[in-house]
Amino acid sequence: MEWPTDRTSGTAMAVWRHAAEAALVDITQDREKITPAIENFKQSLAACENFRTEYRNIIEEFVTIMASASNEQALDMAQAGIDALHSLMIYRLDSHTAVPAKDAFVVTSSYEKLRTVHIQGTQEIDSSDFQLPLVNPANIKEELYGHGACAQVDAWQQYGVLETSASVYAKTALVSRSLPSVAHRKKFCLLGCTSELGPARSLLLIPGAEVLGVCRGGEKYTSLLQYVEARSPVTTRLTVPENGADILTQGPEIAQWILDQTKSEDTLVLMPLAYADGEMNVRLCVAMDLIMQRITRQRRKAIVYQYSTPTQVLVLPPMAASAAQNRLGKRPTWEKFTSSLSLGNWLQPSLPESNNDYCILNGIATAQGPNYILAKTLQMWRCMIAYYRDDLCVSAPFAPICRTRSVVAYKSIAIVLEGMHHFEPMLAFDASVASSLMCAIMMSQIQVVNRPVPDMDENPFTLFWDGSAHGGVWTCPYTLESISTVNWMLGRTMYPKGYIPEAALAKEKTPEEKTKRTMAAIKALEEMEQSQFGKPMPECVRERLEFM
């Protein structure tokens, strides 16, 4: 997967322009509002002299147009953006032949077949006793189970780093004894299976789980295979291409390999997880998108599941927007003084005083670069089209900002993450902790396969609200961009590496607190059911009350 040979600095801008122009076709609603907005956007692109430094505001204009347009127009913009990238990229068949990327994926069966390796687990585990673990944020070498894991999820919810829906999903999976049956007849296809944030290692602990993993060969590939042999149940299997496969150079072969490993009756959970730095990330995401497009046209029972990033331009739920505004009013006076001292560059309110039809939050940090945002926006577009037009099951919850190896490799960014939690409820997660949390959320979300027909009257951006663990970005009173410098100073001088606020960790309840809470729940239940006090309570009911 390559950029065109005549690539210029305007190539990325052409994608945004193409997507915006799609909304001009057959405008039937809000003509007086949408047309001027698009013209202003095109003028911003034309006047842009350095896209890398100006892209943050330009992309906010674009998302504002999408959120304000009719739902069909927003989807037209998403489809136009996808088409622009598919047409833009080229795929090299050999050293002498290159074709448009979209054409290379039409007949994938004509390519050389990838050889397959199956790795089976070795552990004898009773599936009826299995519980999904949650990595302990206070000590990542430990795992939490059952009610202990739920207590930590409650702490995160109360702190403000995840939504109620995410809390419910996670706790449901963490106390469930039936996850092996949830995984039955599903195949989890992970494009980038060695991703730190990805769910591979958690999934491979579930008895009966079947994972199709795609990644390049190397140390991480070998480590994952060894993990399966050491920790996975005997009924769990990891299937990978022999010696790995490169998504950038073997996309059509990978698409055909996945089709060959699955049947039409299988429920295939497709996850794009691979990441690369810089412009390579755009090429990688286009390759994954074309793989997914090829597969979903043949496997109609596929579930598209991806992790969205809160560090892009977002449309916020009203409750989150209200929480951010409330937090802004409670911040200390010195922060307002600091903002004035910096001429408004530091500590900017996350939400403008007047907005459009929806609350728009610009979560972009300029240091990420425009290629990162273009790649993540492509994935957002794909989810919208897959759900609202292709009639597929789609979940795309937001995942928190994490200390992944690729992030902390940049020393300045690593320091910023250490000071981030000063602005409550912002919180950077260790990658293994976030991975286990997001896997729990996923295992609950994929159970809801008989979803209602998508409501075309709802804004397409609402698709991304369900089950989100945004790490506090949604409800922080300031934009991520405007607190980065202050975060760096605080991370450099005040907070030790890996520091976690006490309020974001589960508090162990005393025996008296546990008894008081359980008895109160029992009394409420007895009054509701008009039962007679003293009757023996079934153990399953008692466990549920303790969970509550």
Q: Where do the protein language model's features map onto the residues?
A:
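Extended alpha-helical scaffolding regions
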Residues: 243-316
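Non-catalytic protein-protein interaction scaffold segments in large eukaryotic complex-forming proteins
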Residues: 1-66
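Structural alpha-beta junctions
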Residues: 207-213, 229-235, 264, 289-306, ...
